[in-house]
Amino acid sequence: VVISGLAAGIDRVAHEAAMAAGGRTIAVIGTSLDRAYPKDHAALQARIAEDHLVVSPFAAGTPMSAWHFPKRNRLMAHLAQATVLIEAGATSGTRHQVSACAALGRQVFAPVHLLEQLDWLQSAKVRPHLQAWRTHEEAVQLVLEALPIERTASHS
């Protein structure tokens, strides 16, 4: 199961790739279920809601707020066995997810170049839970070795 935030960029790609591979996906959104953000993800959100799962910690009609996205990221840390970083910036909301993973004792997989760029990945509480990778192939191998993932030919 791929759990991601339905944001533009890698989140969208993660959801679409999971579905294309016949897997399952969970979208944890930073808005209430009656809203889509970004708006051009409304059809994807509806498709995930129909065939997979969309989760929100916010009641219907809740106005959008910037603090919703760190809350969404912390919720993803609680739902997932591990977090795989692909991209993040110095002020990225992903740091909230990584911090929550560390507090929960969950693993974080991150590319070496992010470790070299981001101070928040070097914190003493995050470091013991962090595994670095250089290539996407190495990331896949690390995840497969670290997590109890059942591989099947098809999903029902």
Model-identified regions with their sequence ranges:
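Glycine-biased, small-residue-rich flexible motifs in mid-sequence functional cores and linkers
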Residues: 1-156
